[in-house]
């Protein structure tokens, strides 16, 4: 270990920054947030330092580096654009046994600054030992996405409850189970973020009163259309906290690789015309696992409330009294059209967009007359097997035969393929495409040649 990671208590302690530019300003901001009593020594200062000085937040000393300013300091930072001056600051601090950071010169420094994820009082620091700051920044960004913004409020509130938890739960095991429930309770976190004291108190009392082996909960998460980068931050957080993930075939391998490693996984792959697991059985799986006290994530491609049968699954849970929540996802229509260079609306071509299922219940019929109207875009989900019928019906109800159409296969993924033509070719084009695929009908498809960006990357 090249460096010992420590967290310094700097509140009301004297610290010195030498330098008055942008880099020094970023360092000063961190020290001020830590409550340091800050002095800044430089030949010139950018305006922000003057603002802080006028507000009494720090002291400015204009002029060359004055090493006597170090005499009362606990910590120093050299942040000038002059290597010679920075080395003088480092040497003067070293002679006084004061820790000193030298910006962009880790070998000249006695401490380095990590990349910080601030969820005070929870703090996470990431460092590459000064060898690769970019790598440390990338790791910090990844951790930022995993830690909810309101986590600090939850941690602070947990501190207020420690004595009560210790009094109510006799064993370490019981306390651990309580805290596990506490920290994954979305309702509590959201209530704290909204400063809803009434909801916070109600949720807290419920957590203390219910048995530790109480029924779990189900979170319905939209995984987006395929590209793992389109998974929402909240969706990522949920699959990282799951005890069990129930997923279908539209969830990509890249997204499944983000699931918590020790979570159980249940595949319930479905596609139009063939159900690997019947819907009623899926409903029962969710119910059964939640009743065991597990945190269940039902992971669905796209958005769970847009042709995802999410409402049906939640009705079962609702009837059984199982708590649930929903994390929306980017629906296939939005993702596939964007990655195909096809805007769903456009002032010149489409003032509305319709999302339509091509897989109806037996005896069902679409409103073809309205679907054939001008100035709109149609997006058919699960319509591949019905492409010839869609073509026939739209033409029969008055849509122009030369209306542009596109079929997007494996949208937003590296396997994405788009075939396009006109309405009279739709049935034929569908023979060239495999599921999962989306059908887009409308004048906006004609913009694809101009706006297609994804296949050019």
From Swiss-Prot:
PROSITE patterns listed in its UniProt record: SUMT_1, SUMT_2
Name under which the protein is recorded: Siroheme synthase
Transferase is among the record's keywords: yes
Region of interest (Precorrin-2 dehydrogenase /sirohydrochlorin ferrochelatase), residue spans: 1-204
Role summary: Then it catalyzes the NAD-dependent ring dehydrogenation of precorrin-2 to yield sirohydrochlorin. Finally, it catalyzes the ferrochelation of sirohydrochlorin to yield siroheme.
Binding-site residues for S-adenosyl-L-methionine, renumbered to this chain: 225, 301-303, 306, 331-332, 382, 411
List of catalytic residues: 248, 270
Residues at which NAD(+) binds: 22-23, 43-44
Region ranges (Uroporphyrinogen-III C-methyltransferase): 216-457
Record HAMAP family: Siroheme_synth
InterPro entries attached to this UniProt entry: 4pyrrol_Mease (IPR000878), 4pyrrol_Methylase_sf (IPR035996), 4pyrrole_Mease_sub1 (IPR014777), 4pyrrole_Mease_sub2 (IPR014776), CobA/CysG_C (IPR006366), NAD(P)-bd_dom_sf (IPR036291), Siro_Cobalamin_biosynth (IPR050161), Sirohaem_synt_dimer_dom_sf (IPR037115)
Organism: Salmonella newport (strain SL254)
EC number: 2.1.1.107, 1.3.1.76, 4.99.1.4
Record CDD domains: SUMT
UniProt xrefs under NCBIfam families: cobA_cysG_Cterm, cysG_Nterm, PRK06136.1, PRK10637.1
Similarity section: In the N-terminal section; belongs to the precorrin-2 dehydrogenase / sirohydrochlorin ferrochelatase family.
Pathway(s): Cofactor biosynthesis; adenosylcobalamin biosynthesis; precorrin-2 from uroporphyrinogen III: step 1/1; Cofactor biosynthesis; adenosylcobalamin biosynthesis; sirohydrochlorin from precorrin-2: step 1/1; Porphyrin-containing compound metabolism; siroheme biosynthesis; precorrin-2 from uroporphyrinogen III: step 1/1; Porphyrin-containing compound metabolism; siroheme biosynthesis; siroheme from sirohydrochlorin: step 1/1
Keyword line: Cobalamin biosynthesis, Lyase, Methyltransferase, Multifunctional enzyme, NAD, Oxidoreductase, Phosphoprotein, Porphyrin biosynthesis, S-adenosyl-L-methionine, Transferase
BP-aspect Gene Ontology terms: cobalamin biosynthetic process; methylation; siroheme biosynthetic process
Modified sites of kind Phosphoserine: 128
Gene3D superfamilies reported in the protein's UniProt record: Cobalt-precorrin-4 Transmethylase, Domain 1 (3.40.1010.10), Methyltransferase, Cobalt-precorrin-4 Transmethylase, Domain 2 (3.30.950.10), NAD(P)-binding Rossmann-like Domain (3.40.50.720), Sirohaem synthase, dimerisation domain (1.10.8.210), Siroheme synthase, domain 2 (3.30.160.110)
Catalytic activity field: uroporphyrinogen III + 2 S-adenosyl-L-methionine = precorrin-2 + 2 S-adenosyl-L-homocysteine + H(+); precorrin-2 + NAD(+) = sirohydrochlorin + NADH + 2 H(+); siroheme + 2 H(+) = sirohydrochlorin + Fe(2+)
Gene giving rise to this polypeptide: cysG
Gene Ontology molecular function terms on file: NAD binding; precorrin-2 dehydrogenase activity; sirohydrochlorin ferrochelatase activity; uroporphyrin-III C-methyltransferase activity
Highest taxon listed in the record's lineage: Bacteria
């Amino acid at each position: 270990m090249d460096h010992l990671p420590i967290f310094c208590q700097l509140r009301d302690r004297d610290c010195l920054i030498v330098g008055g530019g942008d880099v020094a300003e970023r360092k000063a901001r961190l020290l001020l947030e830590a409550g340091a009593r800050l002095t800044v020594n430089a030949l010139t200062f950018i305006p922000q330092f003057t603002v802080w000085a006028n507000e009494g937040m720090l002291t400015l000393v204009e002029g060359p580096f004055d090493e006597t300013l170090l005499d009362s300091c606990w910590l120093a930072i050299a942040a000038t654009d002059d290597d010679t001056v920075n080395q003088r600051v480092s040497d003067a601090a070293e002679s006084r046994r004061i820790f000193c950071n030298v910006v962009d010169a880790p070998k000249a420094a006695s401490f380095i600054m990590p990349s910080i994820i601030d969820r005070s009082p929870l703090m996470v620091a990431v460092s590459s030992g000064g060898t690769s700051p970019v790598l440390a920044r990338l790791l910090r960004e990844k951790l930022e996405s995993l830690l909810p913004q309101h986590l600090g409020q939850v941690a602070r509130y947990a501190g207020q409850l420690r004595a009560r938890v210790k009094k109510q739960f006799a064993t370490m095991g019981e306390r651990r189970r309580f805290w596990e429930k506490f920290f994954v309770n979305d309702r509590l976190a959201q209530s704290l973020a909204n400063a809803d004291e009434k909801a916070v108190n109600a949720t807290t009392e419920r957590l203390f009163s219910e048995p530790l082996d109480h029924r779990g909960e189900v979170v319905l998460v939209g995984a987006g259309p395929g590209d793992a980068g389109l998974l929402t931050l909240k969706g990522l957080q949920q699959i990282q906290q799951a005890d069990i993930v129930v997923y279908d075939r539209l969830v990509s391998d890249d997204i499944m690789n983000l699931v918590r490693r020790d979570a159980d996984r249940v595949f319930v792959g479905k596609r139009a015309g063939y159900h690997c697991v019947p819907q009623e059985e899926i409903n029962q799986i969710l119910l059964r696992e939640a009743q065991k006290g597990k945190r269940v994530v039902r992971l669905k491609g796209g958005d769970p409330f847009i042709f995802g049968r999410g409402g049906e699954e939640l009705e079962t849970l609702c009837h059984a009294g199982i708590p649930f929540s929903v994390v929306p996802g980017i629906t296939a229509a939005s993702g596939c059209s964007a990655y195909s260079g096809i805007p769903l609306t456009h002032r010149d071509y489409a003032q509305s967009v319709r999302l339509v299922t091509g897989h109806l219940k037996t005896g069902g019929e679409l409103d073809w007359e309205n679907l054939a109207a001008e100035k709109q875009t149609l997006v058919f989900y699960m319509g591949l097997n019905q492409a010839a019928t869609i073509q026939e019906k739209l033409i029969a109800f008055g849509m122009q035969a030369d209306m542009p159409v596109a079929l997007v296969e494996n949208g937003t993924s590296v396997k994405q393929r788009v075939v396009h033509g006109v309405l009279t070719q739709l049935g034929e084009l569908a023979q060239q495409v495999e599921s999962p695929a989306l059908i887009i009908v409308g004048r906006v498809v004609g913009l694809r040649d101009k706006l297609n960006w994804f296949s050019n990357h």
